[in-house]
Amino acid sequence: MTVLKPSHWRVLAELADGLPQHVSQLARMADMKPQQLNGFWQQMPAHIRGLLRQHDGYWRLVRPLAVFDAEGLRELGERSGFQTALKHECASSNDEILELARIAPDKAHKTICVTHLQSKGRGRQGRKWSHRLGECLMFSFGWVFDRPQYELGSLSPVAAVACRRALSRLGLKTQIKWPNDLVVGRDKLGGILIETVRTGGKTVAVVGIGINFVLPKEVENAASVQSLFQTASRRGNADAAVLLETLLAELDAVLLQYARDGFAPFVAEYQAANRDHGKAVLLLRDGETVFEGTVKGVDGQGVLHLETAEGKQTVVSGEISLRSDDRPVSVPKRRDSERFLLLDGGNSRLKWAWVENGTFATVGSAPYRDLSPLGAEWAEKVDGNVRIVGCAVCGEFKKAQVQEQLARKIEWLPSSAQALGIRNHYRHPEEHGSDRWFNALGSRRFSRNACVVVSCGTAVTVDALTDDGHYLGGTIMPGFHLMKESLAVRTANLNRHAGKRYPFPTTTGNAVASGMMDAVCGSVMMMHGRLKEKTGAGKPVDVIITGGGAAKVAEALPPAFLAENTVRVADNLVIHGLLNLIAAEGGESEHT
């Protein structure tokens, strides 16, 4: 897998904590002269070479790596009550312990194999575990149970509980995706693979664990310990040895209790950590959906309970995979072939979508100063069966500009007292911004839970919608551009380019950028807290964000908040709301 020699591994392990090391010490470890170290370092893998920084005779890595030396690992194991083996490279750490379990099952108990590179690393259902050197903490260990294999079906979820406890001890908030993935929101942090050997009336369980230590650039939807450590505002860097020792301590304590009492004492903790509890999911086998429904929980055997349209279902892990059900909530299709042009007249831009057979065909947008793209599309696509429906907060002059591009009357729809089963609690619905109303109606294509609906445009609106169809109102604040503009006009020294967002900004530009984003995120989280309290009973409250700044706001929300809640970015939410309304059964509006 690599051409690294023992000297490379020694030097890399010495630098892995990210702290400065003098070149004389590193040269002794590599058995060479200090001036030879640069050539020696060029033999490291490319993604490792670029991490090196040199200053005044000291070397350090810009971020720590999950790389160990045998002696340090042995001492760690002794403190934790485990025998250790270090394999810089192997086929699979699970295979190493499985082989030991078949030869000497008693020796496999609490023997841990740590590896840096695996050629045949795998997860559940034989999936390949992708990683690069130093990016992932990977280890396997054996545990002997006086039980048959069929009684250990809940071992993988209980191992996930132990890992989550360890991460929590380090200040890192994570969740569990059934049965045993460690996740942060939709991003995967780690996985667990359980394999067993039955011998001599006992079962040796081999527990393989892989946790992303550094964020893997080549893997989508991934989280890492290092990134969580930084966003949790912890000082210094994450340390792989501390992480491993904390994991072993929790695994030891949890598995001792599990061997005695089973999974029952851990069910409540697992339920609280389950990312998808109370949410819609799909269960797949070989890529095909076999169940879809709402997660109701797990039982004392780790079996998943699902509420489906056909009734209650129970699912054991086996070869089943779970996915969040992200499909937009369907709306009835019109029975005729009428086509629509839907318009969203915002303050600064016009957006539009052509709808055919209940779905978007094409979408577009343009500033009001040049709406010719809309006129060109109209000339190209119009026929006798196009109905134009819109929502506008842009004012009468801009609405007239839009009308000039279209040779047919536009039906501009206002807010209303109710529509599509949603009651509007605004005191005077006629004063209610229609974009906020149609954002609320559009959110139902993405979630049936209670929702905080956020629109990031010229203004930022943060609205509350209950799961039983009550629009409670919400807040309005200046958008990012208006906040920046007001600071420029009303202050003497803040008329400068906004910088970047930082936890503790140390320049004025960065302070402005961070303050604006904190204001928006704080507003979202306060509304979420109020709606969560009102909804009660542990029900989920989702966040749906739309508008030009939506993605940045979603990224800026605290990791703990993202881990505990569903946050979705939805483009063109107003247009989705218009589509929901016109697609109601028979095309007749409930708008009253």
UniProtKB/Swiss-Prot annotation:
Compartment(s) where it occurs, according to its Swiss-Prot or TrEMBL record: Cytoplasm
GO biological process, one term: protein modification process
Domain of life: Bacteria
Catalyzed chemical reaction(s): biotin + L-lysyl-[protein] + ATP = N(6)-biotinyl-L-lysyl-[protein] + AMP + diphosphate + H(+); (R)-pantothenate + ATP = (R)-4'-phosphopantothenate + ADP + H(+)
A GO molecular-function annotation: biotin--[biotin carboxyl-carrier protein] ligase activity
The protein's annotated pathway: Cofactor biosynthesis; coenzyme A biosynthesis; CoA from (R)-pantothenate: step 1/5
Binding site for substrate: Y426, G433, S434, D435, R436, T508
Keyword Cell inner membrane: no
Annotated SUPFAM superfamilies: Actin-like ATPase domain (SSF53067), C-terminal domain of transcriptional repressors (SSF50037), Class II aaRS and biotin synthetases (SSF55681)
Domain BPL/LPL catalytic, first and last residues per copy: 83-259
Spans annotated as Biotin--protein ligase: 1-329
GO cellular component: cytoplasm
Enzyme Commission number: 6.3.4.15, 2.7.1.33
Pfam families: BPL_C (PF02237), BPL_LplA_LipB (PF03099), Pan_kinase (PF03309)
The entry's keywords: ATP-binding, Biotin, Coenzyme A biosynthesis, Cytoplasm, Kinase, Ligase, Multifunctional enzyme, Nucleotide-binding, Potassium, Transferase
Protein's UniProt keywords contain Lyase: no
Catalytic residues in the record: D435 (proton acceptor)
Cofactor(s) needed: NH4(+); K(+)
Cited function: Activates biotin to form biotinyl-5'-adenylate and transfers the biotin moiety to biotin-accepting proteins. Catalyzes the phosphorylation of pantothenate (Pan), the first step in CoA biosynthesis.
Family: In the N-terminal section; belongs to the biotin--protein ligase family. In the C-terminal section; belongs to the type III pantothenate kinase family.
Protein name according to UniProt: Bifunctional enzyme BirA/CoaX
Source organism (scientific name): Neisseria meningitidis serogroup A / serotype 4A (strain DSM 15465 / Z2491)
